[in-house]
Amino acid sequence: MKFSAVCLPFRPFPAVWLACKISPGKESRKASEGREKKSKFNKLKFKVMHSKIFQITRTRVDKDNYLNEDTLMQGDDSFFDYCAEIDDEERQYHIDNLVNNILPKGMFEFVSDDTIRYNGGAAQWREDFVADIRSRAEAVTPESVQEWIGPVYQLEKFLKNPLDTAYWFYMDEEGLQSHAEQSYEFLRQVCEFEPGTLLYIGGVIDYHF
């Protein structure tokens, strides 16, 4: 007996479940990692829901204290659904991208693959940051103040993340802190450093949000 094929106008339930699952167990994370490696960390596929967290400190961190997939709070009450380890190739790609394309131009340079030098530039960054705050604040009016994703929301986002990046930062040298920071907190601390200060990149992990 032959059966005719039936074309469903929607995905079968298991596919939808996999796409929507928020906090997978260890096995699910391994499967996710495998898929990412096979696709050579396809930027188009993962740029929306995945990004990276960098451990950057003023002293070189022992590998036992590297940021890893279990360091941060994840799941409920956390920005991160889950975190995962990455391979060396992906790690270096994102370190290069951070220094060359994300951080303020000229403020940092490579000394080695996992060491960067702060060259100065805090005064200029502070001036630019304040000017941007004032410009964005001008868009807040009595008429726009209650807009759902309006100028108030955009200003709040900018104050936390002036680099407008999905990268997060972890500056604890002992690996005890259970949360990461957005780009404002990283730059705020950098502005306290003397030009020439060396910064060391420890653990770099993937996160899903």
What do these predicted ranges mean?
Residues 48-49, 169-209:
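Acidic, proline/glycine-rich low-complexity IDRs
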Residues 3, 10-13, 41, 46:
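Aromatic (phenylalanine/tyrosine) cluster motif
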Residues 74-173:
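Low-complexity, serine/threonine/proline-enriched polar segments
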Residues 29-48:
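Short, Lys/Arg-enriched N-terminal segments with co-localized hydrophobic residues
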Residues 42-82, 198-209:
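Short, extreme N-terminal segment that most often corresponds to the first beta-strand
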